[in-house]
Each structure stands twice: as structure tokens, then as C-alpha cells.
Regions:
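Long, repeat-rich segments with strong aromatic
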Residues: 302-396, 405, 421
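Intrinsically disordered, low-complexity regulatory regions with latent secondary structure
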Residues: 1-28, 44-129, 135, 139, ...
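Cys/His-enriched microdomains
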Residues: 20-23, 30, 37-40, 344, ...
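Residue position in alpha-helical solenoids
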Residues: 176, 183, 221, 323-327, ...
């Protein structure tokens, strides 16, 4: 290379830097030309410009707009039309009259614990969603509906009109989302965000079937607009974010596969080189597809299990063990930086144990995974507390805000430990953490904690609603899981809404005004596993207790755990 060429390359550092680039270019890590109202790089790439951060020069002062081509002129209906004038990031006087609800919603979504969120996901809730709240009516309506729901059903600030404001705003948001879906005026991403917020509203009100429908709608919309065959209309970073939400479906409902189809098998190079959260999301997505297929064979004779299912089980376990090996938590005291990795490891460990036992009908099979269960508990205990929670999670004169995050976090792993690890002290440590873990998507720590308590009472022969505190020092003999016999162990359990009625299509409809919809915990226990396998284990079944004489079932009230 000649000296002249080398010198020319070095002068590149003198090019004007992009300090106020649009959110889309920043997420893609490309230089933005800062054209207003939409940057030309986004338009040329057929992407929706998400607007500019606070402090960015206005259209009149932007040097790049003076010579912009006609392509840079965006119609008023585009996604970033609101970003063409003054800064719009969480400015109170630019919000609608219902701004307190939007501010409450954004505060909850931004300031809840990080858990497994990566940097892009943190920016998504702190920047992209507030930006779209100003520029897209359907997102604004959905955000305000979420704020109303949180205020009425979580904070319970006005018990006399519970649900009325939420219902009114929910209907408005639903109509605007349907209008956006029919026209795609602002592209798919605002529609997906609106669907996700509507699903969160249903989850907070414990109408999980309706929430499932909204989440599936967002995932179907994402799948149809992120195809690699055509020009994708959604950044792949956001595809990864929504793909993670699909795991809620598989973890919450027993034997249900994720909505999105499985991806090609992940390679060792991809496990090693990819970001931990993205590689784990892909591993878990494939794993829960396997678990869904294998669950039907859990209570069958070993000889009728297809050999390819056993081979697939080995492949899934190998992938998860490799991920755990590649993503160790550093021994140094860096909990703040490792919070996301700690949470990801708990999710992987829970899936590893579940996949290992999914083809074994005996609950005693879980006793072999004490180290994995105990690492889940110690990892959650090592998470840093929410910084200045009393100050940062307050809203006006309301009480301290309870955390809510749409993404997966720690509730499912803790709930899994409390139910399946029969060590007396470790399961109580998991239960103690569970009831304080807030809300994550369809999961509620308080509700899952109450359901897990019923399992502990049943398995340990303790009177219903008795204290679960253990007096005295640790006793390795008494605490050993082997003390709980197979015939006393609960196989399946979960919160149910017994007051709900099914319509002619089997859909569950709840009383709109009811605060609590999950009022009971449904428990299934096999009295004689060997006799059940002998009499009923000749064909795969998703509900082995139906038509069998070897199962007992009952319901306990869901009572708060002190």
C-alpha cells in the first residue's frame, strides 16, 4: 500500500461524527445522516426511521435536510413523523391529557429489575416505546391502557371503580390496533408493540387465554414480516426480542410447544461466538419444542418411546450443557455486570432438568439434580437488589411500584425448584425468593408462590395453610428428598380459575369486574406409578389422569404465603 493511500485512509477520522443519529441507525450500528424528518439511510434500506433522541437539532437547523432528496420527505403518517420538530422523549407537555397513565406505564416498564434484558432490550423500553407513544396512536392507546390496568389491578388505588378505566382504554387500544393491522400505516413494529401491551394487560388481569391470543398475534405478525426471502421490515434485533417472549407459552403451559417453528440446529461455533442471550434463546426454543413432543410419552412404557425422541433428548441436553460451559459466571465480584448472565443460567438449568426428566414418569428422577436446583437458588440470591427502589419506583403519591416486565426472568426457575426439588430447606429458600419476585409476563410471584405452597403441604404431610418455617438447625437426614416417597409426590399442579365458564367453543370467559381470577390450585398425584404404567402406559397421552384409576386430584384455595 502506498504512503498516499495510507494517508488518505487516516483522514477518515476527521469525518463529522453522528452524535444525534436516529434510534434505528444506532441499533444497527451504522452512521446516520441525521436527515429530518426521516434519515435517508433508513429510507434507502426500506426501514422505518424510529426518530431522534432528545437534544437532536430540529428540521430547520439540520444541515443534512437542506440538500436532501425527495426521498427524505416523509408523509405525516410515517412512523417518525413526530420527530420532525421538537424533542419528544418523555416530555410531559407533549403528552395527551391522559399522560399520567402513559408516564406510569413507562416508569414501570423502564424501572423494573433488569433480569435477563440485554442492552438493546433496555433501550427498547426506555427509548423506542416512549418514542412510538408520541408518534403512533395505537401504541399511545395501548401504553395508556397498560398504565390504567397497572393502576387499578396492581396498585389498586381506587377500589370503587376497579376495571372501568382499564376496560374503556383497552377497547380503544384494541380498535386502533385493529386499524393499524388493516392498513400497516406505520409498519409492523408498532402493531407488535400494541399486541404485546394488550397481552400484558390480559396477563395482569389473569385472563391468560386472551393474553395468549394477543401474544400469538404479535409473533405471527413478526414471522410474516421478518422472512429472509423478502426484504425484512423488522430489524433482526427486535425479532430476537419477540422470539424470547415466545418461550412464555412453553414454560407456563405444560406440554405446549412455542408458537414459532423451530430453527435449524445450533452449531458449536454459534454457541461459542454468539451473544449469550441470543444463543440461549435459540437453544431453549428448540428444547421446549422437544419437551412438547416428549411430554406425551412421559407416562408410557419405555419400549414404545420412539428412538429418535431419545436421540433428540441427548442432543438437547448436550446443547444446554455446552451453553452452560461456555457461559460461566466470573469468580470476581461483578454482580452488577453479571445480572443478566445469572438469570440466563437459571433459565438454562431449569430447562436442562426438565428435559432430562420429561421421558421419566417417576418424580424421584428429579432427586439426581440437586446441584442444578441449588445453583438456581444461589444465582437468584446473588442478584443485586433494585438500586434505590424506594426512590426510583415511586409514582406521585402512590405506594412503591411493584415490578412488572414482559420478558422471562426468574419466576419460572424458582417455581420449578419449589415444586420439584424435595429438599426441605432449599425448596423453602426458593419459595421465599419466589413470592418477592414481582410479575413477569403471565407469571406472578405471589400466585405461583401460593401454588407451590400447596404442593409442599401435600407432599410433606403438613396441615393446609400451616407455617412452612423450619425451626432448629439444618438436619441433613430430615431434609433429604428421599424422605418424600414417590406415592406422596405431586406430578402436576397449577393455578386455575374455577369460577370461569367456558363458552361453546371451549374458551374461558371471566367476570370483567373480578380482581382475582386464579382462585384455586389444581393438583394431580399418581398413587401407584408401576400399576399405572402397567395398565395405562400403552399409548402416548397428554393427560394421563383422564380415565385412569391410579390418579387422585383435588383443589386447594390459593392463599397468600406469609
Amino acid at each position: 500500500m502506498s504512503p498516499e493511500t495510507d494517508k488518505a485512509k487516516r483522514t477518515r477520522t476527521n469525518v463529522r461524527q453522528s452524535k444525534f443519529g436516529c434510534f434505528t441507525c444506532k441499533a444497527r450500528r451504522v452512521k446516520c445522516d441525521e436527515a429530518k424528518p426521516s434519515c435517508r439511510r433508513c429510507l434507502a434500506a426500506k426501514r422505518h426511521c424510529q426518530g431522534y433522541p432528545r437534544g437532536a437539532p430540529s428540521e430547520s437547523s439540520s444541515p443534512s435536510t437542506a440538500t436532501s432528496s425527495p426521498l427524505s420527505s416523509s408523509p405525516p403518517s410515517t412512523l417518525s413523523s413526530a420527530s420532525s420538530s421538537s424533542p419528544i422523549f418523555l416530555i410531559p407537555d407533549l403528552l395527551s391529557p391522559s399522560s399520567p397513565l402513559a408516564k406510569l406505564a413507562c416508569t414501570v416498564l423502564v424501572q423494573s429489575p433488569r433480569r435477563a434484558k440485554n442492552t438493546l432490550e433496555l433501550e427498547f423500553w426506555s427509548r423506542i416505546v416512549p418514542q412510538l407513544t408520541h408518534s403512533v396512536p395505537s401504541v399511545q392507546a395501548a401504553v395508556e391502557a397498560f398504565g390504567a390496568c397497572y393502576k387499578e389491578y396492581v396498585l389498586k388505588s381506587d377500589s370503587t371503580t376497579t376495571g372501568l378505566e382499564t376496560t374503556k382504554r383497552y377497547i380503544k387500544a384494541l380498535k386502533l390496533a385493529q386499524l393499524d393491522l388493516s392498513t400497516m400505516q406505520h409498519g409492523p413494529l408498532p402493531c407488535m408493540i400494541a399486541c404485546l401491551l394488550l397481552a400484558s394487560i390480559e396477563a395482569i388481569q389473569q385472563r391468560l387465554y386472551s393474553g395468549h391470543v394477543h401474544l400469538n398475534g404479535a409473533l405471527a405478525l413478526m414471522a410474516s414480516h421478518s422472512s429472509e426471502e423478502a426484504t425484512p421490515m423488522i430489524d433482526m434485533e427486535y425479532v430476537s426480542l419477540f422470539r424470547k417472549l415466545d418461550l412464555h407459552i412453553a414454560t407456563y403451559a405444560v406440554g405446549i410447544a412455542p408458537h414459532l417453528p423451530p430453527q435449524p440446529p445450533i452449531t458449536a461455533d454459534e454457541l461459542l461466538s454468539g451473544p449469550p442471550d441470543k444463543s440461549l434463546s435459540r437453544v431453549l426454543h428448540s428444547c421446549y419444542h422437544f419437551i412438547s413432543a416428549g411430554y406425551a410419552y412421559k407416562y408410557t412404557s419405555r419400549r414404545i418411546i420412539p428412538p429418535e425422541l431419545l436421540i433428540e433428548q441427548g442432543r438437547q441436553l448436550s446443547n444446554m450443557r455446552q451453553w452452560l460451559e461456555y457461559n460461566q459466571v466470573p469468580s470476581s465480584n461483578t454482580c452488577d455486570q453479571d445480572e443478566s448472565l445469572l438469570v440466563l443460567r437459571t433459565q438454562c438449568l431449569a430447562a436442562l432438568v426438565y428435559a432430562s426428566c420429561v421421558l421419566d414418569p417417576r418424580e424421584t428422577a428429579y432427586d439426581c439434580f440437586g446441584p442444578e436446583f441449588e445453583e438456581i437458588v444461589t444465582s437468584v440470591e446473588a442478584l443485586p437488589p433494585n438500586i434505590n427502589q424506594d426512590q426510583t419506583l415511586r409514582y406521585g403519591d402512590l405506594s412503591t411500584l411493584l415490578s412488572y416486565t414482559p420478558e422471562m426472568g426468574i419466576i419460572h426457575p424458582l417455581y420449578f425448584v419449589a415444586r420439584k426439588y424435595r429438599h426441605r430447606r432449599w425448596r423453602r429458600r426458593a419459595l421465599h425468593l419466589l413470592i418477592k419476585s414481582g410479575r413477569e409476563g403471565p407469571w406472578c410471584g405471589e400466585i405461583e408462590g401460593a401454588a407451590a405452597s400447596s404442593v409442599i403441604w401435600a407432599e410433606e404431610g403438613i396441615a393446609y395453610n400451616a407455617s412452612l418455617d423450619l425451626a432448629g438447625p439444618e438436619d441433613t437426614v430430615m431434609d433429604d428428598p428421599i424422605n418424600i416417597l414417590e406415592r406422596n409426590r405431586v406430578h402436576v399442579s397449577g393455578p386455575v380459575a374455577v369460577d370461569d365458564k367456558e363458552d361453546e367453543y371451549g374458551n374461558v370467559e371471566s367476570n370483567q369486574m373480578s380482581h382475582k381470577r386464579l382462585t384455586k390450585v389444581h393438583i394431580f398425584r399418581c398413587c401407584d406409578i408401576e400399576a399405572m404404567l402397567r395398565d395405562d402406559g400403552h399409548q402416548p397421552r397428554f393427560h394421563p389422569w383422564k380415565g385412569s384409576n391410579h390418579w387422585e386430584e383435588w383443589m386447594d384455595p390459593l392463599e397468600p404465603v406469609s
